[in-house]
Amino acid sequence: MNNKRNIIFIYNAKGGQWNYLIDTLHKYLSPKTYECNLCQITYDLKMRKAWKDFIEESHHDYKFLHLEELSDFGLEGFINDLPICLEKSNGKHNILIDKNEMNSFQDEYELIASLKNKL
């Protein structure tokens, strides 16, 4: 088994129930203009089952952040690179999946396959 790794996903969206409602409506009413593909491919009204199962069955630690949380974790430098997946290792944040790759995924299965390949 591989070592436990610290994986951080950062949504290109704000957190909170009000923003969740607005984002959900935006995804369905105008999906082509929605700016968070990570949200788009991992959530419908709730977390998609395949994605949820992957996260829950993994031995890695996952953290999910929203725009307003970047400064709490010293990640302001990534504000223009969202959505993104990072790995925290030895106090540094390394990019696992950059914005371009994240935005290329058509569904959660492509994201899961990419993560399995990299982890």
Regions found by a protein language model. Give the residues of each.
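Charged phosphate-binding loop/patch that engages nucleotide di/tri-phosphates or the phosphate backbone
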Residues: Y109-L119
